[in-house]
């Protein structure tokens, strides 16, 4: 058989073809790695019945989920009550037809037991998990008191008289969390009302469960935890896991007079008793989270304070350790 001899030109052409093939494969892998796998919209601390424009704020969150064709919608607690006014707001929430999830906030059980509230909101339990695509999502319950001997669940506002005992994840739940994480091979993202990094009194014990699972798996398996409660916004990394505080959709609680008479008419301040001690946002706040094989992109809403703004009432840029901000900053997480 007469074989065609290799030449420098044919070798060069072959090398170029091989290089282009490798580059194309690399580009394909890169494209697949950055392709959105799951997108969800998250909001926190709407307090929809306690602000004058609660319905409008809820509609904005629902419209965002619909507009972006989100895979699911989740709120991180302090949402609505179960009375008739709350039911009307829940019909707004139902305007998003996809899966919707709830986290127990402390104010959600100001008038109810956990059993009553979870049943009224059609939640699978006070803590639970679910899968979507390549990801495993875990919802925790920090509405528990501990006096050094006994764990007591929040119920009908009982936590208000025991401020030093609040914000615990109970042992039963910790044990469940340990087994729930170990039972999945998917990357894990957590939701809680009280932050695991700062607010939970036994947050270190919760973080140890998360970090231990990453050590057991030998990879970044638990990657992100989102929380609310403090009406603030920040992102930090502890033990290789990213923790992000999702700001309230509605306002920051200041806890002292904020010259609200310059913000709202007298009838509004009288009807909504939180307003004189709070500072509202000009826009509803929420975030869109896009998950890929490479990481997460969090796109937040930027707003301003309804005047008078913090410096006009003698406030600085934080309340304790929490930033005083009217926005949810964009963030990116790599894994």
Residue ranges and their predicted role:
Residues 2-18:
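Bacterial N-terminal signal peptides that target proteins for export
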Residues 179-198:
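Short acidic, glycine-rich surface-loop motifs adjacent to enzyme active sites
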Residues 85-183, 205-222, 232-280, 285-290:
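Extended active-site neighborhood of metal-dependent phosphoesterases/phosphodiesterases
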Residues 268-335:
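A short C-terminal boundary segment appended to hydrolase-like catalytic domains
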Residues 40, 73, 137, 188-189:
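Hydrophobic beta-strand anchors of alpha/beta hydrolase catalytic cores
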Residues 142, 191-196, 229, 301-302:
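Short, well-ordered beta-to-alpha junction loops that form the rim of enzyme active sites
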Residues 28-88:
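N-terminal active-site segment of His-dependent metallophosphoesterases
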Residues 45, 77-78, 105-106, 193, ...:
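Active-site glycine-centered loops adjacent to acidic/histidine catalytic or metal-binding residues
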């Amino acid at each position: 058989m007469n074989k065609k001899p290799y030449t420098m030109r044919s070798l060069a052409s072959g090398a170029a073809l091989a290089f282009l093939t490798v580059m194309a494969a690399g580009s394909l892998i890169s494209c697949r790695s950055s392709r959105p796998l799951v997108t969800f919209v998250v909001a926190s601390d709407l307090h929809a019945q306690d602000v004058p424009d609660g319905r409008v704020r809820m509609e904005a969150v629902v419209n965002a989920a619909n507009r972006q064709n989100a895979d699911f919608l989740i709120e991180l607690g302090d949402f609505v009550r179960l009375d008739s006014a709350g039911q009307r707001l829940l019909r707004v929430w139902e305007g998003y037809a996809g899966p919707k999830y709830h986290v127990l906030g402390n104010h959600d059980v100001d008038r109810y037991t956990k059993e009553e509230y979870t049943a009224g909101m059609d939640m699978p339990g006070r803590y639970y998990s679910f899968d979507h695509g390549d990801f495993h999502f875990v919802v925790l319950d920090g509405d528990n008191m501990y006096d050094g001997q006994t764990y007591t669940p929040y119920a009908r506002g009982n936590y208000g008289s025991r401020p030093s005992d609040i914000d615990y994840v109970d042992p039963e739940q910790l044990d469940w969390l340990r087994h729930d994480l170990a039972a999945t091979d998917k990357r894990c993202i957590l939701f809680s009302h009280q932050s695991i990094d700062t607010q939970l009194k036994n947050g270190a014990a919760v973080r140890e469960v998360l970090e231990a699972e990453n050590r057991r798996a030998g990879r970044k398996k638990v990657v992100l935890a989102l929380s609310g409660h403090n009406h603030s916004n920040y992102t930090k990394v502890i033990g290789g896991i990213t923790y992000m505080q999702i700001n309230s959709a509605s306002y920051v609680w200041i806890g002292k007079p904020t010259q609200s008479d310059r913000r709202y008419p007298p009838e509004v301040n009288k009807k909504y008793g939180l307003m004189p001690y709070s500072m509202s946002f000009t826009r509803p706040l929420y975030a869109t989270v896009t998950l890929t094989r490479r990481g997460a992109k969090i796109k937040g809403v930027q707003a301003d304070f309804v005047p008078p703004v913090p410096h006009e009432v003698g406030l600085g840029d934080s309340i304790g350790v929490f930033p005083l901000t009217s926005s949810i900053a964009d963030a990116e997480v790599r894994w």
